[in-house]
Amino acid sequence: MGHTFQKIYDAGTDSKIKYDYIHGKAALSNNIDSCNLVLDIDEYLTGDARNQDNYFIQFKKFYQRIYKGTGCHYVDWLNDVNIFNSRFPKTKPMPLNLFIYGHSLDVTDADILRKLLLADNSSTTIFYHNKEALESQIANLVKVIGEDEVIRRTDGSHRTIHFKQSSLDIV
Protein backbone atom coordinates (compact mmCIF):
# COMPACT_ATOMS: atom_id res chain seq x y z
CA MET A 1 0.00 0.00 0.00
CA GLY A 2 1.53 3.30 -1.06
CA HIS A 3 1.03 6.83 0.07
CA THR A 4 -0.61 9.39 -2.20
CA PHE A 5 2.12 12.01 -2.13
CA GLN A 6 4.80 9.42 -2.84
CA LYS A 7 2.75 7.97 -5.69
CA ILE A 8 2.51 11.39 -7.31
CA TYR A 9 5.96 12.86 -6.72
CA ASP A 10 8.28 9.89 -6.22
CA ALA A 11 6.88 7.41 -8.72
CA GLY A 12 9.80 5.78 -10.49
CA THR A 13 12.33 8.36 -9.35
CA ASP A 14 15.43 8.25 -7.24
CA SER A 15 14.08 11.10 -5.13
CA LYS A 16 15.60 12.41 -1.96
CA ILE A 17 12.28 13.76 -0.69
CA LYS A 18 11.92 13.25 3.05
CA TYR A 19 8.56 12.34 4.54
CA ASP A 20 7.23 12.62 8.06
CA TYR A 21 4.05 10.75 8.87
CA ILE A 22 2.96 12.68 11.94
CA HIS A 23 -0.34 10.76 12.00
CA GLY A 24 1.25 7.37 11.40
CA LYS A 25 0.96 5.13 8.35
CA ALA A 26 -1.85 2.96 7.11
CA ALA A 27 -0.66 -0.52 6.19
CA LEU A 28 -2.54 -3.71 5.44
CA SER A 29 0.02 -5.61 7.48
CA ASN A 30 -0.89 -3.70 10.66
CA ASN A 31 -3.06 -5.15 13.38
CA ILE A 32 -4.50 -3.50 16.48
CA ASP A 33 -1.12 -3.65 18.22
CA SER A 34 1.07 -2.46 15.36
CA CYS A 35 -1.23 0.20 13.89
CA ASN A 36 0.19 3.64 14.66
CA LEU A 37 -2.54 5.81 13.14
CA VAL A 38 -3.37 8.87 15.23
CA LEU A 39 -7.08 9.61 15.67
CA ASP A 40 -8.28 12.18 18.14
CA ILE A 41 -10.88 14.33 19.81
CA ASP A 42 -10.81 18.11 20.09
CA GLU A 43 -9.42 19.63 23.28
CA TYR A 44 -12.41 20.23 25.52
CA LEU A 45 -10.72 21.43 28.72
CA THR A 46 -9.29 24.83 29.60
CA GLY A 47 -7.01 26.25 32.25
CA ASP A 48 -5.54 23.94 34.90
CA ALA A 49 -8.08 21.22 34.11
CA ARG A 50 -6.38 20.74 30.73
CA ASN A 51 -3.26 19.43 32.49
CA GLN A 52 -4.90 17.89 35.55
CA ASP A 53 -7.86 15.95 34.13
CA ASN A 54 -6.23 13.12 32.18
CA TYR A 55 -9.17 10.73 32.05
CA PHE A 56 -9.38 10.87 28.22
CA ILE A 57 -5.73 11.74 27.52
CA GLN A 58 -5.28 8.67 25.31
CA PHE A 59 -7.63 10.30 22.77
CA LYS A 60 -5.56 13.48 22.41
CA LYS A 61 -3.24 13.83 19.42
CA PHE A 62 -0.10 14.83 21.30
CA TYR A 63 -0.46 11.76 23.54
CA GLN A 64 -1.05 9.40 20.62
CA ARG A 65 1.91 10.80 18.67
CA ILE A 66 4.16 10.11 21.67
CA TYR A 67 2.63 6.73 22.58
CA LYS A 68 2.54 5.39 19.01
CA GLY A 69 5.91 6.86 18.05
CA THR A 70 4.68 8.56 14.90
CA GLY A 71 6.68 11.04 12.87
CA CYS A 72 8.51 13.85 14.57
CA HIS A 73 11.30 14.26 12.01
CA TYR A 74 10.00 17.77 11.33
CA VAL A 75 11.64 18.92 14.59
CA ASP A 76 15.04 17.78 13.32
CA TRP A 77 14.41 19.38 9.93
CA LEU A 78 13.64 22.73 11.56
CA ASN A 79 16.71 22.46 13.80
CA ASP A 80 18.96 21.53 10.85
CA VAL A 81 17.77 24.52 8.85
CA ASN A 82 18.21 26.87 11.82
CA ILE A 83 21.71 25.53 12.59
CA PHE A 84 22.80 25.84 8.96
CA ASN A 85 21.44 29.37 8.64
CA SER A 86 23.09 30.49 11.91
CA ARG A 87 26.47 28.90 11.04
CA PHE A 88 26.56 30.39 7.55
CA PRO A 89 24.83 33.76 7.88
CA LYS A 90 26.45 35.22 4.75
CA THR A 91 25.23 32.47 2.44
CA LYS A 92 21.77 32.23 0.99
CA PRO A 93 19.50 30.84 3.76
CA MET A 94 18.57 27.18 3.43
CA PRO A 95 14.92 27.01 2.41
CA LEU A 96 12.37 24.79 4.07
CA ASN A 97 10.03 23.58 1.31
CA LEU A 98 6.90 21.98 2.74
CA PHE A 99 4.19 20.12 0.86
CA ILE A 100 0.97 19.39 2.71
CA TYR A 101 -1.21 16.86 0.97
CA GLY A 102 -4.53 15.48 2.17
CA HIS A 103 -4.63 17.39 5.44
CA SER A 104 -7.52 19.40 6.84
CA LEU A 105 -5.21 21.84 8.71
CA ASP A 106 -7.44 21.35 11.73
CA VAL A 107 -6.61 23.19 14.94
CA THR A 108 -5.92 19.85 16.67
CA ASP A 109 -2.61 19.89 14.75
CA ALA A 110 -1.90 23.56 15.48
CA ASP A 111 1.20 22.81 17.57
CA ILE A 112 2.96 21.23 14.59
CA LEU A 113 1.46 23.36 11.84
CA ARG A 114 2.45 26.64 13.54
CA LYS A 115 6.08 25.53 13.85
CA LEU A 116 6.25 24.55 10.19
CA LEU A 117 4.23 27.33 8.58
CA LEU A 118 5.84 30.14 10.57
CA ALA A 119 9.43 28.87 10.30
CA ASP A 120 11.97 31.27 8.81
CA ASN A 121 12.55 30.72 5.09
CA SER A 122 9.65 28.30 4.79
CA SER A 123 7.68 27.93 1.60
CA THR A 124 4.55 25.84 1.92
CA THR A 125 2.37 24.35 -0.79
CA ILE A 126 -0.98 23.09 0.44
CA PHE A 127 -2.83 20.81 -1.94
CA TYR A 128 -6.61 20.70 -1.99
CA HIS A 129 -9.01 18.32 -3.72
CA ASN A 130 -11.87 20.69 -4.59
CA LYS A 131 -13.19 24.18 -3.78
CA GLU A 132 -15.07 22.92 -0.74
CA ALA A 133 -11.85 21.47 0.69
CA LEU A 134 -10.03 24.74 -0.06
CA GLU A 135 -12.68 26.72 1.84
CA SER A 136 -12.29 24.45 4.84
CA GLN A 137 -8.47 24.56 4.73
CA ILE A 138 -8.41 28.37 4.61
CA ALA A 139 -10.86 28.61 7.53
CA ASN A 140 -8.82 26.11 9.55
CA LEU A 141 -5.57 27.90 8.70
CA VAL A 142 -7.01 31.12 10.16
CA LYS A 143 -7.72 29.23 13.41
CA VAL A 144 -4.14 27.90 13.46
CA ILE A 145 -2.04 31.00 12.65
CA GLY A 146 -4.55 33.87 12.69
CA GLU A 147 -6.18 35.99 10.00
CA ASP A 148 -3.40 38.60 9.75
CA GLU A 149 -0.73 35.92 9.35
CA VAL A 150 -2.76 34.08 6.69
CA ILE A 151 -3.19 37.31 4.72
CA ARG A 152 0.50 38.22 5.06
CA ARG A 153 1.69 34.79 3.97
CA THR A 154 -0.72 34.31 1.03
CA ASP A 155 -0.62 37.78 -0.57
CA GLY A 156 1.89 39.41 -2.86
CA SER A 157 4.95 38.22 -4.73
CA HIS A 158 6.77 37.14 -1.55
CA ARG A 159 4.04 34.83 -0.29
CA THR A 160 5.16 31.81 1.70
CA ILE A 161 1.92 29.80 1.59
CA HIS A 162 0.50 28.63 -1.72
CA PHE A 163 -2.67 26.65 -2.36
CA LYS A 164 -2.67 24.32 -5.34
CA GLN A 165 -5.45 22.10 -6.61
CA SER A 166 -4.44 18.48 -6.85
CA SER A 167 -4.93 17.42 -10.44
CA LEU A 168 -4.37 13.69 -10.06
CA ASP A 169 -6.70 11.04 -8.78
CA ILE A 170 -4.61 8.33 -7.16
CA VAL A 171 -6.39 5.19 -6.06
Task: Report the location of each language-model feature.
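A generic signature of intrinsically disordered, low-complexity regions enriched in glycine/proline
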Residues: 44-46, 80, 84, 110-115
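Detector for Asparagine
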Residues: 30-31, 36, 51-54, 79-85, ...
